[in-house]
Design a protein with these regions (language model features):
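Small-residue (G/A/S/T)-rich helix-start motifs and N-terminal tracts that mark the onset
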Residues: 1-73
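Short amphipathic alpha-helices and their capping/turn segments at secondary-structure boundaries
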Residues: 22-23, 85-90
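A cross-family glycoside hydrolase active-site/sugar-binding cleft signature
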Residues: 35, 77, 97
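N-terminal glycine-rich "phosphate-gripper" loop used for MgATP/nucleotide binding
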Residues: 72-85
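Conserved small/polar residues in nucleotide/adenosyl-binding loops
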Residues: 91-98
Length: 102
């Protein structure tokens, strides 16, 4: 089975973000994994709050994924800060950066 990682925010209403990505993966018979960049309070009327994941916790999520079930593909959505973008680059750049992850 193919695997995919979504890096994005979590939408409590299920219409966007991690939740929507995982539904899409499942519909295409892809094993989905997620690394959450932020929790959002939102619905179809709008976003009322955002709580960003700490860079340390975000890195812990990516470490857990990339040391076990390495994804065949990565989909990136909402990334809430420059620090989280820089962490994403350590795991998703075309050049190997394993030594920089520590």
């Amino acid at each position: 089975m193919n695997t995919a990682l979504t890096i994005a925010g979590s939408d409590c209403s299920g219409g966007a973000g991690i939740q929507a990505d995982l539904k899409t993966f499942a519909a295409h018979k892809v094993y989905g994994m997620s690394a959450i960049t932020a929790l959002t309070a939102q619905n179809t009327l709008g976003v009322t709050g955002i709580s960003e994941s700490s860079p340390e916790f975000f890195k812990a999520q990516l470490d857990a994924i990339f040391t076990d079930i390495y994804p065949d593909a990565v989909k990136i959505g909402m990334v809430a800060s420059k620090e989280l973008i820089e962490t994403c680059l350590l795991y998703t750049s075309p050049s190997p950066r394993d030594t920089e992850r520590s």
